Amino acid sequence: IWRLAQQVKVRQRVIATAVTYFRRVYTRKSMSEYDPRLVAPTCLYLASKVEESTVQARLLVFYIKKMCGSDDKYRFEIKDILEMEMKLLEALDYYLVVFHPYRPLLQLLQDAGITDLTQFAWGLVNDTYKMDLILIYAPYMIALACIYIASVLKDKDTTSWFEELRVDMNIVKNISMEILDFYDTYKIDPQRGLPEDKISPVLNKLPAKS
């Protein structure tokens, strides 16, 4: 989905919605039942319509075939995406609303007075869609975890601000650990991810109580 989205040039919110649909579908359907090579572009197609940034199905098929190359012929066509769209709608119970962490992220950064961390924290939120967090946690809790990680890495003291929040800090800690584990597991470039020697300090500074 990410690679295809880059080719057709859609907004990040469209990508996030498509990824969420993709993950939701496979909590109910198996990959043997619904081929992910067809589900992925269909989720992007559906998300682009829901987010009012419609991408034509023919463009999706064109770029997928281009990405696959001659050695790996992509057998699905436009009609397959349109047919799968109806199946996905049914699998999703026609519930297409997705609440993302982006809006609460901006609001919370403003409240904390650290809007200079917006770009860094936004990047962290983007990466959470490579995990299952959006299916498990409330969007604003994901936003808080990304703000916390960003504030520690950028040496911003947000301790008192976090203490004033009426949220379960254990949940924020759990989300932070999952994000950090993701970076550590996949050895993300320290320039855009998290250096290994930063992981323990981040977790140690996290308030343990709500």
Q: Over which residues does each language-model region extend?
A:
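C-terminal regulatory segments
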Residues: 175, 181-210
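Structured all-alpha helical bundle cores of eukaryotic regulatory proteins
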Residues: 1-180
